[in-house]
């Protein structure tokens, strides 16, 4: 057994079932090893950003890692933007990055690079194997670390000679660490502060936004009439009919400040206090109300459901939560589609258990608002703010749950970053509906130009925000997918 075979067998033994890949010459031993694994599905992406984004979508929807297979430092670099999003989303994910054979590095061949340096900013853990057998050991470590609550990005660098080297052995599995929990004393203290607050709120993120965790947030709301608020860009939000409803923090800083105004106490579970996405002249960066008591009770690596349940119990909250969402069917005027009636139609038709990948940009407010009362669904959004996520995440979500309908809400400009994902959707016959927002512009940047104080921008400035020449939405119709205009 060579090192590549030992690694792939170790990954399969650890429950890894999918490899999203864009391999090169240095990964051919790994490609051959995947071929011998009946339990591992291999999915090709034509661009590394599709590969890493798909692994992110898969990990968000399964809470376990897929593996990516990437070609040296440049291949990894091509996938970094969506690894940034995955890291911000705290997704369990394993990257396998091929490297030159150890003895070949001294020649400084054209594709030689500092892979550790490239990987480190977008990874929580990086390791280069030391031998063929150590390649499997590194894989076992990555399986365990990637699933440390709520999830981590692990990168294993595989030198070519370690992949082809013989006499390698399969590594034993390593037990995944159990989630950390809050002390009884901290729970009791937080309960008393919430009970004594005049205008309280729960501010939630990460796994606090799953249905079972939100149930306990709703219990607390029923006890003290607290607002339940989530991050602007949550990694995975379960919502719709039968789920405790939640308010989403607005994107723009001044709107967020107004949204939080009047709160006297905010308890944070699974999220830090919010800040503005960017600095602006004469606009706030810190968004929480001045004078409000801010309690950071549980960071994202603390068991969120356990925290909320014990907090509700300590407050003697009722078992029946408040703010359970009911389903609503919207009446709309027929005619030319706009963001509001398109959102109403989507909300009316969204099937139960659907998965929404949201990169709708400036159209997103309408879709998020109207689908709040749709059938139960999962909502995945661009958590790290790096555009080009929407289509690849939809791929990963559809691979994770082939029996569930996936809807990709995709702004036209950001979709062009990873347009190759459509090819993978067609190749894998994935059940995905892609709804394109034909803005013909970088709509958000037209807004931001004014917000940073630029008045009367000239022709050259505006041309950098215009997507109408040529109309890029046409590009979406040429990748073997059936389309409706």
Give residue spans per PLM region:
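N-terminal cofactor/phosphate-binding cores enriched in small/glycine residues
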Residues: 2-81
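Active-site diphosphate/adenylate-binding microenvironment
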Residues: 4-8, 12-17, 22-25, 30-37, ...
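Structural signature of the thiamine diphosphate
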Residues: 17-18, 60-97, 120-172, 190-200, ...
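Active-site nucleophile and cofactor-binding loops and adjacent substrate-binding regions
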Residues: 22-24, 43-53, 68-75, 130-131, ...
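Alpha-helix C-terminal capping segments
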Residues: 33-35, 54-65, 80-92, 223, ...
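Glycine-rich, anion-gripping cofactor-binding loops and their flanking helix/strand elements
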Residues: 60, 206-297, 374-404, 416-420, ...
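Thiamine diphosphate
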Residues: 96, 104-111, 366-479
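Phosphate/pyrophosphate-binding active-site segments
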Residues: 133, 270-364, 479
């Amino acid at each position: 057994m060579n090192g590549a075979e030992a690694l792939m067998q170790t990954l399969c033994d650890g429950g890894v079932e999918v490899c999203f890949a864009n391999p090169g010459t240095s990964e051919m031993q790994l490609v051959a090893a995947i071929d011998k694994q009946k339990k591992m599905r291999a999915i090709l992406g034509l661009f590394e950003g599709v590969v890493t984004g798909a692994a992110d979508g898969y990990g968000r929807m399964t809470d376990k890692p897929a593996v990516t297979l990437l070609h040296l430092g440049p291949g990894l670099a091509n996938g970094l933007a969506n690894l940034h999003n995955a890291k911000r989303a705290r997704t369990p994910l394993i990257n396998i990055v091929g490297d030159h054979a150890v003895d070949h590095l001294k020649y400084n061949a054209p594709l030689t690079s500092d892979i550790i340096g490239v990987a480190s900013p977008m990874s929580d853990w990086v390791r280069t194997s030391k031998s063929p057998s150590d390649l499997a050991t590194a894989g076992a470590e990555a399986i365990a670390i990637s699933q440390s609550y709520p999830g981590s990005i692990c990168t294993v660098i595989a030198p070519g000679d370690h992949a082809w080297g013989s006499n390698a052995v399969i590594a034993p599995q390593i037990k995944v660490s159990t989630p950390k929990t809050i002390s009884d004393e901290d729970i009791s203290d937080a309960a008393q502060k919430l009970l004594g607050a005049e205008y309280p709120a729960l501010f939630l993120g990460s796994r606090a936004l799953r249905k079972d965790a939100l149930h306990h947030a709703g219990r607390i709301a029923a006890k003290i009439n607290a607002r339940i608020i989530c991050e602007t860009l949550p990694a995975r939000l379960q919502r719709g009919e039968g789920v405790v409803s939640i308010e989403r923090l607005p994107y723009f800083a001044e709107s967020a400040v107004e949204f939080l105004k009047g709160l006297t106490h905010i308890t944070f579970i699974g999220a830090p206090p919010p800040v503005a996405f960017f600095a602006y002249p004469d606009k706030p960066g810190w968004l929480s109300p001045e004078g409000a008591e801010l309690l950071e009770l549980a960071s994202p690596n603390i068991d969120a459901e356990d925290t909320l349940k014990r907090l509700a119990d300590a407050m003697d909250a009722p078992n029946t939560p408040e703010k359970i969402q009911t389903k609503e069917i919207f009446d709309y005027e027929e005619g030319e589609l706009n963001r509001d009636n398109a959102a109403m139609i989507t909300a009316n038709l969204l099937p139960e258990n659907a998965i929404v990948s949201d990169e709708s940009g400036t159209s997103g407010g309408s879709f998020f608002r109207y689908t709040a009362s749709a059938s139960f669904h999962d909502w995945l959004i661009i958590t790290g703010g790096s555009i080009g996520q929407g289509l690849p995440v939809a791929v990963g979500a559809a691979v994770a749950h082939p029996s569930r309908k996936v809807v990709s809400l995709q702004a036209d400009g950001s979709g062009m970053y990873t347009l190759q994902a459509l090819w993978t959707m067609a190749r894998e016959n994935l059940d995905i509906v892609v709804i394109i927002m034909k803005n013909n512009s970088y709509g958000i940047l037209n807004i931001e130009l004014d917000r940073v104080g630029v008045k009367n921008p000239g022709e050259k400035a505006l041309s950098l925000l215009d997507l109408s020449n040529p109309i890029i939405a046409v590009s979406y119709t040429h990748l073997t997918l059936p389309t409706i205009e």
